[in-house]
Amino acid sequence: MQNADPKELAKFSELAHKWWDPESEFRPLHQINPLRLNWIEQTVGKLDGLKVLDVGCGGGILSEAMAQRGAQVLGIDLAERSLKVAQLHALESGQTRVEYREIAAEALAAEQPARYDVVTCMEMVEHVPDPASIVQACSQLVKPGGWVFLSTINRNPKSFLLAIVGAEYVLKMLPAGTHEYAKFIRPSELLRWCRDTGLDLRHTRGMEYNPLTRRYWLSADTSVNYLVACRKETA
């Protein structure tokens, strides 16, 4: 049984043709991409020459950006239409350092254990039935001493007001129904799953947004959107 919600896959498949439109529903992802990309590269040192896996890659916004920094990237997702958009965009961009596969993280972990220097799973774990299983797969896929980067949304009244009411219904930055509050993940929960799978927390950052300036920035405030960087324990 795949660790995926058919409703979530259908939701993103319907929007697949808009992945690379920076003025579409995916505008927030385009806006935060430089922030998360730079944070990843600053943490790792450099991406050039590294083998990177992007779990839940969608249309390839982050995957392709990491390939542009010199990484050899594999993006995986279970939304077929999104993957086709990602493949087409890479072809049109002449980007040969990125490949895409329709496969679950758990299945790839069984096939390619300890294969990657870096594993990213951004804005994805809050969309699956069993996020702990995704974290475990990421841990299995990364090499000992390698890095795993995760980002998601905290679960509290503030995140409900800002990430759902504000973003989806007031500012209409995202389609209504993009997120389910019950699927939001507290940092304590995410970090417990990381520890249980041999991942050592190294850095945590929050991501904030000013609707007046339409600007995102990283901060110490993890009450809504947040990112974590973990390192796989060595034997």
From Swiss-Prot:
Pathway: Cofactor biosynthesis; ubiquinone biosynthesis. Its EC number is 2.1.1.222, 2.1.1.64. O-methyltransferase that catalyzes the 2 O-methylation steps in the ubiquinone biosynthetic pathway. S-adenosyl-L-methionine binds at R36, G56, D77, M122. This is Ubiquinone biosynthesis O-methyltransferase. Belongs to the methyltransferase superfamily. UbiG/COQ3 family. Signal peptide: none annotated. Keywords: Methyltransferase, S-adenosyl-L-methionine, Transferase, Ubiquinone biosynthesis. It comes from Leptothrix cholodnii (strain ATCC 51168 / LMG 8142 / SP-6). It comes from the Bacteria. It catalyses: a 3-demethylubiquinol + S-adenosyl-L-methionine = a ubiquinol + S-adenosyl-L-homocysteine + H(+); a 3-(all-trans-polyprenyl)benzene-1,2-diol + S-adenosyl-L-methionine = a 2-methoxy-6-(all-trans-polyprenyl)phenol + S-adenosyl-L-homocysteine + H(+). GO terms for biological process: methylation. The gene is ubiG. It holds the Pfam family Methyltransf_23. GO terms for molecular function: 2-polyprenyl-6-hydroxyphenol methylase activity; 3-demethylubiquinol 3-O-methyltransferase activity; polyprenyldihydroxybenzoate methyltransferase activity. InterPro entries: SAM-dependent_MTases_sf (IPR029063), UbiG_MeTrfase (IPR010233).
